[in-house]
Amino acid sequence: PEQNLLIKGLRLIREHYALPHLYISLHKQIPSGAGLGGGSSDAAHTMKSLNQMFNLGLSDNELEERVTGLGADCPFFVRNRPVFATGIGNIFTPIGLSLSDWHLVLVKPDIFVSTKEAYARISPRRPETPITDIIRRPVEEWKDLLTNDFEEGVFALHPEIADIKARLYDQGAAYASMSGSGSSVFGLFRTVPEETDMRRLFPESFYFQALL
């Protein structure tokens, strides 16, 4: 428990503010080892909640600065908005991106991807077209332009993850990608996929589907 990001976030707040004894219950629905920032979002939301509950008066900028010490991706979860991240992932530029009315399919196989190993295998490349320009284009044009540099190394280790991405495209996804360092893969669909059929394609995986 002492290494839990949620507990670390609570400690960060307690370094500067006197809080009463607390009972915190976490109902975790984001799968672990999925490349979805589950632990980081838990920590960020805990600090946001404490700020609101006890009227600590911390601005979003201050919260982002404080949670950076818990992990490079923690600040991203302080605000619910699309951003372009630079630095170590903690310097944000808001972007005008809306995926409203797109259908999201998320598939997380029973595979754990070591973040350390994923980083060791990465070959970063500067895209020919800046990412900020790519995302201004229609989603249907992202497929060959918007890439995840982690995929090459992770797919070599776990071809099953590459297969999930291919199957999402086969089922009509306009865009599909591994999330972060894996192992989950998401697809964006213009029309709603038949959920029963989709679940049959991924019987051993965590499956989630939603309208954005």
Regions found by a protein language model. Give the residues of each.
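Glycine/threonine-rich beta-strand-loop-alpha-helix active-site module
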Residues: L56-P94
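Residue-level signal for inorganic ion chemistry
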Residues: L6-G9, G39, V107, A118, ...
